[in-house]
Amino acid sequence: INAVTQDLYLSDKSDQRLIVFDEAWQFLGESSTLKEVIEEGYRRARKYHGSFTIITQSVLDMKLFGGVGDVIRNNSAFKFYLESSDFEKALDEKLMDYDEFTMRILKSTKSNKPKYSEIFMDTPFGVGVGRLAVDPFSYYVFTSDASEITEIEAMVDGGVSYEDAIREMVKKYRS
């Protein structure tokens, strides 16, 4: 983490930097040092032509962040949400602050894999829902579905290249 933050704070400020913490909850367990790094990053990154991003499975994970969660929410100009059943609870727990109309839009967000995933976007320019649709090959390259990954890995273990395994998945499941 030192190398990452050093790169942000000491590098040429004309170069943009994006620091992403995927499954962010795991970084915030008992390590108060890492909490401080993330909190400082969310407060200062803009000054260095950088930004911090966290990815979690649920908006409710923000509770695990403690006070850092407030800093993250208050310093995040852009928020993106995929389909979830946690939105009402997050609203009740003050992890979100949307009016009834916006909540209806947020809760309407759906995923229809492998065809598309809808994404609710809360930006300085407004809120709304967009669709991410990818071609079938790209879908299987980036899938996080355990059964699909298992099927691809089984083909690879059987001597098929990843590319051919993915092409086979596309043929098998094309609808």
Predicted regions and their residues:
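Conserved P-loop NTPase motor module
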Residues: 2-10, 108-175
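Conserved P-loop NTPase motor cores
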Residues: 1-104
